[in-house]
């Protein structure tokens, strides 16, 4: 029965991606329910894998993946990327390279979503439009551990690893392991 549900959800999700004006490469595989709000540009490379909710990944529990691309924003996801029960909130520019793995329950966002000014934040008409937005880049072969938060304006370098439960608030150079809240340097990766 589970296999039938997975096949059906996969077919339904491919239709959902097509009708959301997402450009995607071959071998798209999305298992479980995924939320999509696409107002800007969104492109996804070949061999994209998304495990969403308890039907597909025990670590994701019953949390569905969600991808939001705001008006005039751009989300670009490379080839061979895998995500699990992940939220990607793009209001400006998010670029995810090739061969990136994103652990369950991770949040990637390029915006504060709300104004940091309490006067603007208290008014629904001025709140979101005054939120600070800065691009995010996750480079090739990066690995983001489960339950991490990737904040606006950061770059995670090639081959770098973010430990589980980390909050990334500043750039991570290539070939390094970072972790914690806020994430700090742990060690170099020797290739």
Task: List the model feature ranges, each with a label.
Residues 152-164:
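Short cationic/low-complexity microdomains
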Residues 1-115, 139-141, 148-150, 158, ...:
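Domain-scale signature associated with acetyltransferase and cell-envelope carbohydrate enzymes
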Residues 170:
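HATPase_c (GHKL) ATP-binding subdomain of two-component histidine kinases
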Residues 64-71, 123-136:
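A short acidic, glycine-rich active-site loop
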Residues 143, 161, 166-167, 175:
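A generic "structured core" feature
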Residues 111-126:
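Acceptor-binding helix/loop patch of EC 2.4 sugar-transfer enzymes
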Residues 131-137, 143-145, 153:
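A mid-sequence, solvent-exposed acidic-amphipathic segment
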């Amino acid at each position: 029965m589970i296999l039938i549900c997975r096949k059906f959800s996969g077919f339904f999700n491919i239709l959902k991606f097509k009708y959301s004006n997402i450009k995607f490469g071959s071998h798209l595989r999305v298992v479980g329910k995924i939320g999509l709000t696409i107002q800007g540009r969104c492109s996804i490379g070949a061999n994209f894998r998304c495990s969403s909710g308890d039907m597909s990944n025990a670590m994701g529990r019953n949390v569905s993946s969600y991808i939001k691309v705001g008006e005039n924003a751009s989300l670009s996801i490379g080839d061979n990327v895998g995500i699990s029960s992940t939220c990607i909130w793009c209001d400006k520019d998010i670029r995810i390279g090739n061969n990136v793995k994103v652990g369950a329950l991770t949040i990637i966002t390029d915006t504060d979503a709300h104004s940091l000014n309490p006067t603007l934040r208290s008014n629904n008409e001025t709140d979101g439009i005054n939120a600070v937005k800065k691009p995010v880049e996750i480079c090739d072969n990066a690995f983001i551990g489960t339950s991490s938060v990737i904040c606006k304006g950061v770059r995670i370098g090639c081959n770098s690893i973010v430990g589980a439960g980390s909050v990334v608030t500043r750039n991570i150079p290539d070939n390094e392991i970072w972790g914690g809240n806020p994430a700090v340097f742990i060690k170099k990766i020797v290739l």
